């Protein structure tokens, strides 16, 4: 058991992954950060947050830009906890992915994706292949 380690995640897709990681590592606790709206800042529930000096692993379901994990990182730092790394189920970096060095980033799968500035630079678009939106 890693009693000195706790897991911190956003309350969206990262929560099921966080509980699995907590169980696998036999970590102490899972904390999750919430947002009232997409534009509001992340926060912990009252009296349920990491303590100063507590070692935590940030966990989420997918890492693309890193924006949500960066916001979570800043929230955890503001509480005085020590971040030991990041863990995600899927690492699918986009061209503007944030750098979390020197923290290690652990992932189960890495997906390469093609990103284009506009339709004229996309081979499939120029061939007339229709665009299908799969998430918002």
Across the structure, where does each feature detected by a protein language model lie?
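Short glycine-rich phosphate-binding loop at a beta-alpha junction
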Residues: 1-11
């Amino acid at each position: 058991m890693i009693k000195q380690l706790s897991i911190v995640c956003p309350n969206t897709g990262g929560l099921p992954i966080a509980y699995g990681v907590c169980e696998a590592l036999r970590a102490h606790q899972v904390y999750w950060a919430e947002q009232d709206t997409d534009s509001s800042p992340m926060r912990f529930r009252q009296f349920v947050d990491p303590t100063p000096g507590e070692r935590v692993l940030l966990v989420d379901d997918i890492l693309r830009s890193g924006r949500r994990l960066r916001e979570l990182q800043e929230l955890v730092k503001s509480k005085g906890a020590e971040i030991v790394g990041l863990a995600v189920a899927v690492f699918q970096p986009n061209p503007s992915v944030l750098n979390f060095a020197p923290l290690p980033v652990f992932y189960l799968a890495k997906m390469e994706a093609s990103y284009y500035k506009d339709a004229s630079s996309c081979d499939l678009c120029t061939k007339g292949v229709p665009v299908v939106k799969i998430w918002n």
